[in-house]
Structure formats: structure tokens, C-alpha cells
């Protein structure tokens, strides 16, 4: 019998949850909240550019929304590259909340280029001229490239007047075709270095050098060892090389499917290409290495997706770049900031190479004795063994062509990230750094921008004496930069309109320039006025831009200020400064714009999994138990039906019929006890082919017990013995087999219409049949004339019907001859007719199951021979066949 399983003890489940919580807490240490959060109402005070011109407070009526692509700051002037337009905006301090352009250049695609673009299947909004390259070529010239309806074009413009200088030139390999594609570009020594795609389908990625006095060079075309779906992020010039930062699919991890890694590649400025045989008009100095930004441990946790890179800055006397990395979109959300020393970057390019000997093999380091000399990737120059790169031996050029990847990765300073943030909603994608913050210019502030314009401000303290490690970074402030009232609401602009394009520091004005597709917002780097009136809040903010003045105000401190102030960026105790009503940290840190720690995310996921597993276990157990309970109840019902009638194990049909006639229903009385009426008890016993409705809907005494199966009616099968005796009355015990043969022969030539009529019930009358005595069947089951026999129910194909064979003499008094027979056998019938005074040849003997009923009243007269009921031997159909009586 099924018994429900006991639920697991609750203390064990709680202990498991607490253990998992502690493990996740150890894996993802909780991150401190910001010391302050700027109120959102301060956004309305930030100046914003939305395309307004001189003398206009708002853009002209009917003007399109901006679609900004590039922003370039040159001294106190900001150039904004838009769709079909180029704006010049002055950044002089102003009390106005509106930034207006002083000059505007309209640069649209010509109709023929638009028509060709539309013919290529592009949308009308894509067939425009999007400014994708915006550079300062010299002190007075701007170099601008636009997508020009998927036919890139470049031109030079005067920086002061925005007038065209010279003719337009092709933008192929200088500017992407699609405005959604990433690209980088810079000028170095009068030469343009670009990283983009060179075709309409964006398949051929390239690092390209053009303009200047040196030949144009490019990377090897369609070689996955050089590039595999790169996404270019930034480019910097340092020493005799130009460094390109990008991310791509790593070919060295091709056995792990698509793994994105961050790279840095470099080329020599003075490279002139290879020989006519190898690498002609292609880079001979191109090498690339992996950038390693990971959390150390037994198994490093990598931040592989490069998002943004700063220029080369000096930190502690070292040339350093800061880069923002994030996790892949299908991983735990998180971002990190790592710093890289350019000297270490250069050292990696002097290390070992990595190679793949066959397409199926893994990548392995190249032994040093197999590296040719001079070293591949070096910058050939006058005074060296080879004066130019095109003079290098083919062995070196071939090695460079097939071995562009370095074996070692570039380590980050301190071998760990300087800043790690785990965000649930938006990753960090932009970075700006101020290495001269504070009144003495000796503090480093890092601004990190998220995808939707939220900026996080950190104070970092590099320690140059200990391998470039940094102490714990201090999360100073969190503030918003996107103005929905001017740049568009999130519902209308969507994620695209709120995407942060660039974040640039304007140290002269003490602000940040945050560019979005529809606007540019200038945000102050600090909000010191929030702490005015409370010395503890001002000093406790640890903000290098803020100081406490003697007049009781918190003021903004510019580099080199001569004002008197108090400041403590080391985070010393402020307990002696008294308390302030409404401490800012407590009042403003509650709302963190949806930034959720990974601790909560992982803990919730684990808890949901455990609870779901427990609930699922209980549910499965309950359903299994329910099925067992139903099966047990079904067995009990069957036993109750079979055991109906008290202590008797089985009720025969005749006994049940007698109880019906007498009105006793067993334990419960006449159909009123627990057993219910006999019809209800007998209905479940009916098998396929028996009409239960006819049984249950009959009259109170219409139950024919002869129609129901009983154990007496289904004896074991009897073996039939062959016989050839022509006289049935002399066969004795073998008459059954002989009658079966006769019935089979008759059934093939005759069709008998069965007629079954019911007669009123009469009391049973004893009758004599030779030496035996029995009770005749009721009228409903007796033959009214020699051709009528009891009707038997239609048999199911699965039902086995066996009746007892006749063994005694035939009772001639049981059949009347007053009615004519409906069927006469042929004269050749093998059944003999009895003489006027002869006895019957056989007696129809019924089992006691057929004796429940009443006999037909009247005298007993000699009758013709009647065969036994052998209908079970005939085939089933719409009507059953019965052996005819002997005339």
C-alpha cells in the first residue's frame, strides 16, 4: 500500500541555502555603493546641444532629429559629425542651458548615389551621408569622411569656416559603407591610418595606410589568422608604431567554437610593404597579441569583450592606457577597468610567436631556434641590416605572413583589474580619465559611462613602486547625463536614442561631454554645492574636486587654485566633525538606477532552483501516489463486486436471479443495500459485445440469468474426437462432435431467422425427462414450437463461449408440437425421427445455470427431437445461426 513520502527536513534545506549564499558571496564580493548619488533634477541645469543655431532656442520647426556619429574637440571648439551635417560649437562657459552651433556644413549625398543605394536593397534612411571619420589633419584642416549612401567619400575642410578644400577623394578603406559598422582612424606623420571594412558586404576587414608620402599598405585579405570578424575600438600612436585595439573571434580557441577575445595589433609607421613575391603592398610588420584583463585565481575569470580605450596617459611616470572590458552577453553581466603599460605591450611583441601546424592541430609556441633573423615584425630603417621592409628576405616575409599572433598575452598592471563592477542592467562602455584632478593636480579620477548614460566616478591611487598595483578604488559618485526632456524620452528614442556614443573630458571648463545620437550634454565633473552647509558631508565625500571653504560652503577646486579650503581624500575619520541633518550618503544612495549586485542575482537563481527542485519532487511523488491510490481503489471495487453477498466468494447468476425473485439483495436487502440492485452489480461483469443498457433498463424481473457468464458456463475446453457414425442417438458421449458437424453442414445452406418472444413469468413446474427430473426454462427462454430456441447475446470476438455437451436422453416433453416448425431439414438429414412410440435419441441437458425460471404448464406429450443449443459454434454477424429442429 502506498504511503506518502516524508518531506525533507526544513533545517537541512535552510542550511543548503545558507551555504550557497555564502559561496556566492565569496565568489562575488559585495561592491560598496557610491558615496553620493546626484539627484535627477540636476539634469535640467546641464547645457545640451540638440541642433539649435544662433538666435534660436530650439531647432527649426520641421527639422529632423539629430543622428550624431562622431565628436571631435579641438581646444575650445567642438565639432559634431551628424547625418548630412557637420556642426561647429563653441565651448566657452555660459549660464545658458543651450549649446548652439556657430557654423553648419550640409553635406548630402547626390541623387545618383541614393538611387544606386536603393537599388542595392537598402532603406531610404540608410542611404544618407553619415559622418564616420572626423579628424584634425593639421592645425587648420579637418579631414572628414562620410558613408555617402554606401559609397564612402572623404574631403578636407577648413576648421574655421567649414569650407571645402580641394576635391573629394574616395573613402574606400578609409570609411565604412554602413553607418552601423565600427571604425577607427588617426593621422600620424601626415599619413592616415584606418581600421574598417573595404566592401559593401563588410567581409574584408582591413588596417589601411594612405595619404602621405609613403605607399598605401593593407593587411592580408581574407586570412582568418590576421583577422576574424574584428570590431575596432581605438588606435593610438606611440613611439615608432601605431597600435590598434579591437576584439575578434579567436582562431586559437576554434575548438571552443566562437570565443571573443580582446587584441592589440601594431604596425611600423615606416613600413613600405614586402617584395614583389611576398606581401607586396601589404604590411610586413603586422603583429597582434591578446589583452589579459582577468580576476586571478585557480581559474582566471576573464573579461574578454573590449569596449573602450583611453589615449596614452602618464601615471606614476609610466605610459599607461586604461581600457574598459565586459563579459559576453551570454555570461554573468560585469565590467572591469584594466590598465596596461605600453612598455609591457611592446615587450610582448618581442616574445615568442604562436603557430598552428595543421588545421586540426592546436596552437603551440614556436621554438626560438625556428624564428628567422632579423626578427620578423621589426621596423626596417636606414642604418640597419636591411634599410627597408621590401628588402627583407622571403623567409622573413613568409614567416610574418603565417605567424602574426604572439604566444603571450599582455598583462594588466597589478595582474588584476583596477575597478570591477557587476551590473544587472547595463554594462560600462565608455571611459574618460583625468590624471591631474584636484587643486594640486596629483589625483586620478576615472569616469565610466554605461550604455544608457549613467556615469560612475572613481578615485584610483596607482602605486608605481609595487608593479603598478593600485589600492582599493573609491566609488565617489554616480550621476546621470542623459536629458530625456531634450534628447527624447526613452519610449520614443528607445535604447538606440539613449546609447552613449562618447565620453570626453573638458578639463578647461571642468566638465564632461557626453554624446548621444540625438544630443550632446555637458555635465560638470563634480557637484560640490550639494554638500554646502555640512562640513562633514563635504570632506567625507573624498572628492578631489571639492573643498570646504571658511565661509561654510563646499566649493569646486580648479587646478592651481589659491583659495583656502579643507580637504581629505584619504578617507580619514570624520566623526569629530559633528552630524548633519539628512546625511547625503544615506539619503541619496537608496536609488541606484537599477544597478543590482550579482550576489542578489546568483543567490536568487540558486534559491529558485532549489525550491523548484523540492516542489518538483513533491509533485512527482504526489502524482505517483495518486496513480497507486486509484489502482488500489479500483482493485477494491472489483473485490467488493465479486465478494457481494456476505461471506460467499462468488455469486452465481442463478442465485442472483433467485434473490431478485425473492427480493433479497444480500446484505443490503432488495436492491437497497450497499451492493445496490442486481442490475448495477451485473453491469460491470458484461464484456464486449453484451448490451449493458438492455440489462439495466429491463423490468424488475426481466433479468435473464442465462445471458450472463458464470464460472459454470466456462469449463475448460474439451477435446473433440473425430466420428463417422451416422446416427446421433447411438453415439452416446460422442454425440456432441457429431452434432457440431451436422450444424456446420446445415449452416452453409440455410439461414435461420431467430425469433425470441417473452412470456409472462409462471411458477416453475417439475417435469420428468426419462430417469431424470429438472425445471424447465421460463417461456422467455423456451421454444414456442420446434423451430424456436432461446436467443443468445451477440458474442464479442474476444469472448470464448463454451457450453456443456449433452450427455443424457432427450426430454421429449420439453418441446411442444402444437406449432408448425419454421424450418424443415432435407430428407437426407442424418438425424432420425422417432417413431410414434419410440423414445427420443437424446436429451437436452442444461446446467443448473439455465434452471432459474418457471416451466410451461400443461401435459407432457411426445415431441420431436430438438438439438442442443450449439449457437456458439456458428460465426458471429448481424444475426446468429441456430441449429434447426428435426422434423
UniProtKB/Swiss-Prot annotation:
The modification Omega-N-methylarginine is found at residue 667. Residues 662-674 have a biased composition (Gly residues). Residues 32-525 form the Sema domain. It comes from Rattus norvegicus. One of its GO terms (biological process) is hippocampus development. Functions as a cell surface repellent for mossy fibers of developing neurons in the hippocampus where it plays a role in axon guidance. May function through the PLXNA4 receptor expressed by mossy cell axons. It is found in: Cell membrane. Glycans are attached at residues 75, 156, 168, 292, 387, 442, 463. InterPro entries: Plexin_repeat, Semap_dom, Semap_dom_sf, Semaphorin, WD40/YVTN_repeat-like_dom_sf. This is Semaphorin-6B.
